[in-house]
Amino acid sequence: MKMLTRLQVLTLALFSKGFLLSLGDHNFLRREIKIEGDLVLGGLFPINEKGTGTEECGRINEDRGIQRLEAMLFAIDEINKDDYLLPGVKLGVHILDTCSRDTYALEQSLEFVRASLTKVDEAEYMCPDGSYAIQENIPLLIAGVIGGSYSSVSIQVANLLRLFQIPQISYASTSAKLSDKSRYDYFARTVPPDFYQAKAMAEILRFFNWTYVSTVASEGDYGETGIEAFEQEARLRNICIATAEKVGRSNIRKSYDSVIRELLQKPNARVVVLFMRSDDSRELIAAASRANASFTWVASDGWGAQESIIKGSEHVAYGAITLELASQPVRQFDRYFQSLNPYNNHRNPWFRDFWEQKFQCSLQNKRNHRRVCDKHLAIDSSNYEQESKIMFVVNAVYAMAHALHKMQRTLCPNTTKLCDAMRILDGKKLYRDYLLKINFTGADDNHVHLCQPEWLCGLGLFVCTQGSHHPFSTPEECCHTQTAPQQVQCQWNWDHILSVLCKHVCANGVQWAGSPRLHHLISVIVNCSSVLVFLDC
């Protein structure tokens, strides 16, 4: 009897009757964006936040979901209009919602591999003249996947995609686990790993001589590996951990309240280091507000510069120091996004929900007791700010396009169209021979090379201030360079750093003593209340 290959066994497992029944509850609810093309890129975005209780999906994630999704569509549009990048080849998309959950994202991602399974025996469907048969109702064959956002999502999806040799580029997943190429051998990213944030956070603590702190991490790969890296850096600097707490995936309010109670049990540890997802950060700050608990927060990019994290709880967030991956706004995206409305954006099935949530109105007649949306409502500078990782989404799409472009030029030298050699993509060849070797100028006019993401290790340092229109200071670009960060030379402005940080931090009852030099932070530029630092890679 002929032995089944691993792929055939997996095929049987995925499409057995029992497995399909387990997915049945989601299929009729699933929304997606499918735009056909000569080559199709998959997309995974946390369009909805994770639900509560038995609900898989929660409210619309306006910035990290809708904006990032539209950034991919924007990049695809720009590439398809480009006469020099993939000329004669149209890129399509298949975009799915992860609902900010790794398990849900894995189920959704089965759509990407289903196309690979149906294409395995495509040669059997050749016409007598040698042309390919027209097959109806078949899934789009995915050339590569852009996403996910959360590290836990990217890890689950990477484990699946590698079995089918489908390259994947994340625009936001920073877990150090994903640097293991022996396990994640089809994964790449346009952001640096968590190690650099952990190192920066430890240096900030050492700078202020905060040697007794508490930590809170989100359960999962992002929070746990991030806080583990921080603890290693803290030990090197003789920083002691008073209590180390975790927030589980249940998203139950009382779990956040209990964490705050545990933190309050250590009254001498007034500084709390957070390596948490954005939704967990928001719930923890809300719990601190309910308890009227005052801490000095030092948080990773899961919080970053998101004003939504502290909305309604500003009084317990003043003085927070948060990190964000340094990026440049993509100005063309601003114009694109501000031109969208429910009447011209029909390709995004989540946009109407986003619009109703953003403007607190109904596009139907007074649904849910809301007022009917005014047709003159618009996205503009008064209600919109570009999400911090839009640049990384755009760069991820362009990275995949440049790799496909070089592959097409090599395999199809005599035509701008797709030749037979590229109709069934060799994902292994695409990833190793082209994607890891791409070199181009990204959306920020900076050098993009996926093999060395450490070159992109700029970190924005934000301070949550009181009495300003925007509660977080906004960093300016620092020492924009195409060279490695260790070659960058900028001057520290210590007086300004102290005036910005100490004014708000020391007001919370935290004593500052001493100013040891931050040996691993080598460059800074200051503008008003903004500080941008680069790590010594």
PLM-predicted stretches and their roles:
Residues 27-32, 57-58, 93-96, 129-141, ...:
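Juxtamembrane membrane-interface segments at transmembrane-helix boundaries in membrane proteins
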Residues 316-317, 327-384, 407, 411-413, ...:
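Membrane-interfacial loop- and helix-cap regions that link adjacent transmembrane helices
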Residues 5, 10-114, 140-141, 150-151, ...:
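Signal-peptide-cleavage-adjacent N-terminal segments of secreted and extracellular proteins
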Residues 226-349, 353, 357, 390-397, ...:
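Extracellular/periplasmic bilobed ligand-binding domains
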Residues 460-537:
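Polytopic endomembrane small-metabolite transporters, centered on the Drug/Metabolite Transporter
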Residues 40, 55, 71-74, 78, ...:
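Acidic, Ser/Thr-rich intrinsically disordered and amphipathic helical segments
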Residues 372-461:
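Segments of small-molecule ligand-sensing domains
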Residues 26-28, 32, 103, 114-249, ...:
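Extracytoplasmic ligand/sensor domains, especially the bilobed periplasmic-binding protein
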